[in-house]
Curated annotation (Swiss-Prot):
Gene Ontology CC: cytosolic large ribosomal subunit
Keyword annotations: Ribonucleoprotein, Ribosomal protein, RNA-binding, rRNA-binding
Protein name: Large ribosomal subunit protein uL14
Keyword Ribonucleoprotein in annotation: yes
Annotated organism of origin: Rhodospirillum rubrum (strain ATCC 11170 / ATH 1.1.1 / DSM 467 / LMG 4362 / NCIMB 8255 / S1)
SUPFAM superfamilies reported for this sequence: Ribosomal protein L14 (SSF50193)
Function, in words: Binds to 23S rRNA. Forms part of two intersubunit bridges in the 70S ribosome.
GO BP term (any one): translation
Subunit (UniProt): Part of the 50S ribosomal subunit. Forms a cluster with proteins L3 and L19. In the 70S ribosome, L14 and L19 interact and together make contacts with the 16S rRNA in bridges B5 and B8.
Family as reported in the entry's similarity comment: Belongs to the universal ribosomal protein uL14 family.
GO molecular-function term, one example from the UniProt record: structural constituent of ribosome
Family matches, as CDD domains: Ribosomal_uL14 (cd00337)
């Protein structure tokens, strides 16, 4: 569960290390985002010579959350930290690699590029 002001790790090689959620997209009163939801983020930490700089504003899709995800078969999955992948205006990943596992709920949200780049889909 991600809300405004939440800090997330970045799970790609776009150059950002940590981002902060500044808006949850999808309705004027929407407050909370989960896995597969698109949010607007500000880059808080970045590596030198990366594609993005500190202070840049981008869209991002959430790929891992510390709050467990319940599945229809009764299982649940959770991670140690929250993580996101930065997107451009066309909702395509900025980076060319994805680090760490992602959940298969992204497939239903049509993020096939992220699914194919990820080393593991849980």
């Amino acid at each position: 569960m991600i809300q405004m002001q939440t800090r997330l790790d970045v799970a790609d090689n776009s150059g950002a290390r940590q981002v902060q959620c500044i808006k949850v997209l999808g309705g004027s009163k929407r407050m909370i985002a989960g896995v597969g939801d698109i949010i607007v983020v500000s880059v808080k930490e970045a590596i030198p010579r990366g594609r993005v700089k500190k202070g840049d504003v981008h869209r991002a899709v959430i790929v891992r959350t510390a709050k467990e995800i319940r599945r229809p078969d009764g299982t649940s999955i959770r991670f140690d930290r929250n993580a996101a992948v930065l997107l451009n205006k066309q909702n395509e990943p900025i980076g060319t690699r994805i680090f760490g596992p992602v959940v298969r709920e992204l497939r239903a949200r049509k993020f096939m590029k992220i699914i194919s780049l990820a080393p593991e889909v849980l």
